[in-house]
A protein has these predicted regions:
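Class II aminoacyl-tRNA synthetase catalytic cores and aaRS-like
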Residues: 1-269
Length: 269
């Protein structure tokens, strides 16, 4: 991906992605925690490990928290603050934080405010395994909405060691609803949301040919390896990590050429 370098990001990375027909995000959470806990037991002989000096317990079941619940637990927000756009804006002001421009370009967008505040205040506290569930529809254009509250979707992100390890959701398989979501994403992009999706006509057309109910998931193998190997940087677990050039023109500098050798030396004589 054409993104920056950090201890958790590398443009070239390894990911396990899969769809599971007739599954959903609840089932995938069960599968994911059993898979990773079993992996730990196979590699380490137990379901506990040390990562950056902290003991992590990978024994299932893992907690499942909404973004609002995480903000209340880890950042001290009240239930009233997490329930509305006005409350979230109040929380931004109290902490001297700027809300994302796309969230306040017009009428405040609850989902964008909620997710931005969660990323700012909660992610660093998520050391022990936890599923952050029911993401706002504004940031989850490919996920099914929750029938009990259409502001949210059947989506989770798994965090371990303060890092996002997996992302999954119940797939949206209605082509008409998906097309409407893409139109909403285009409006969000015009309002300044650089992460909003473009309209994918090919994907909508594929859904028109029918897709069964399904769950889809992506697991970051490099970050998971960081956890098991107790490494603080993704560079330590990638065979050929991309290096940041020391000078702006370094990437275009030709490799040094060897000095000219006598013919007898070049031939091994």
């Amino acid at each position: 991906r054409n993104e920056g370098l950090s201890t958790q990001h590398n443009p070239e990375f390894t990911m396990l992605e899969f769809y599971w027909a007739y599954s959903n995000y609840e089932h995938l959470m069960d599968v994911t925690e059993e898979l990773i806990a079993g992996l730990a037991e196979s590699i380490l002989g137990e379901k506990k490990l040390l990562y950056k000096g902290k003991e992590l317990n990978l024994s299932p079941p893992w907690p499942r928290l909404s973004m609002g619940a995480a903000l209340r637990r880890f950042a001290g927000l009240s239930a009233e603050q997490t329930a509305s756009s006005a409350g979230l804006l109040e929380a931004f002001r109290e902490r001297g934080l700027e809300p994302p421009k796309a969230a306040v370009a017009g009428e405040p967008v609850y989902g964008l405010l909620l997710s931005a505040l969660f990323e700012e205040l909660c992610e660093a506290h998520l050391d022990q395994p936890v599923f952050i569930i029911d993401h706002p529809v504004e940031i989850s254009p490919l996920a099914k909405q929750k029938p009990t509250d259409p502001r949210f979707t059947e989506r989770f992100e798994l965090y371990i060691g303060g890092m996002e390890i997996a992302n999954a959701f119940s797939e949206l398989n209605d082509p008409d609803v998906q097309a409407e979501r893409f139109l909403q994403q285009l409006a969000a992009r015009e309002a300044g949301d650089g992460e909003a999706h473009r309209f994918d006509a090919d994907y909508v057309r594929a859904l028109e040919h029918a897709m069964p109910p399904a769950g889809g998931e992506g697991v970051g193998i490099d970050r998971l390896t960081m956890i098991f190997a107790d490494r603080a940087s993704i560079r330590d677990v990638i065979l050929f990590p991309l290096l940041r050039p020391e000078r702006a023109d370094a990437a275009f500098e030709p490799a040094p050429q060897p000095a000219t050798q006598p013919a007898t030396d070049a031939a091994g004589g």
